[in-house]
Regions:
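Cytosolic catalytic domains that perform sulfur/thiol-centered chemistry
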Residues: 19-245
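Positively charged n-region of N-terminal signal peptides that target proteins for export
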Residues: 1-5
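Bacterial N-terminal signal peptides
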Residues: 6-16
Length: 245
């Protein structure tokens, strides 16, 4: 019995050390080379979540057409609110179901992979990242450049459907990651507080708008900061840290 307990203890220690080593260079934004190296060392080092549609007519637009080996399909549409208000955060029950379907726990390293055709695809990945963080997950990252960057780097691609064992993680919405209408309204009257409108400039100016929007325009007092500015030439890759600063 003592020998068995000793072996279990050693295995636990080895697993913990390996896990800590894998996360020693973990960061919220991973390059394709960094993710590939991580998965080469251990295919189970991170849960890779592909948020593209399962099927699509356009080449490379769908999970079934090809994905990062081991990646799990979790289409972006499932992370959005109802059609009349897609920007609204999903219910806690749905959030729990989505997280458990990934087989994820609170400390599971998760990498979100978007299509990678334009900067707007990164926005979809950021929405899922935010949702997972709001659910209570702590080790999260987005693949810089998305699936297109992975493919263009000539890295392995699989067409095998991954079906992980569901977890029993009890997702709890962390309210400090959400801003309610009343809170935003209160902040608008406080000195030193800025509300940034990261939508396209045409949305801010009221020249165009989402079909679900009740009216064109922006929040009174908001500052325009089109999120396209963060990306290199309007593509899917974030600018260098030096330029972002």
């Amino acid at each position: 019995m003592k020998l068995r307990l000793l072996l279990i203890g050693l295995l636990t220690l080895i697993t913990s050390v390996t896990f800590a080593s894998e996360l020693s260079h973990w960061k919220p934004l991973l390059s394709v080379d960094e993710l590939h190296e991580l998965l080469e060392e251990d295919p189970f080092a991170a849960t890779v979540v592909d948020i593209r549609a399962l099927d699509a007519k356009e080449p490379d637009a769908s999970y079934n057409a090809g994905h990062i080996p081991g990646a799990i399909s979790s289409p972006y549409a499932t992370w959005r609110g109802q059609p009349d208000n897609p920007g609204k955060f999903i219910t806690q029950d749905k959030l729990t179901w989505l997280v458990q379907a990934l087989g994820a726990e609170a400390d599971t390293p998760v990498v979100v992979v978007h299509r990678g055709d334009s900067y707007s695809d990164f926005g979809a990945a950021a929405r899922v990242y935010w949702s997972l963080k709001t659910a209570g997950l702590t080790n999260l990252a987005i693949l810089n450049g998305g699936f297109q960057a992975w493919k263009q780097a000539g890295l392995p691609i699989s067409t095998e459907l991954e079906t992980p064992l569901p977890s029993d993680f009890p997702a709890q919405i962390q309210p400090h990651w959400l801003a309610q209408t009343a809170e935003v309204e209160a902040y608008l009257n406080k000195p030193g507080v800025e509300v940034l409108d990261a939508r396209p400039d045409s949305f801010f100016a009221g020249l165009s708008w989402h079909p679900a929007a009740s009216k064109p325009g922006t929040i009174a007092g908001a500052v325009a900061f089109d999120n396209e500015r963060w990306f290199h030439s309007g593509g899917p890759l974030l600018e260098s840290p030096e330029r972002l600063q």
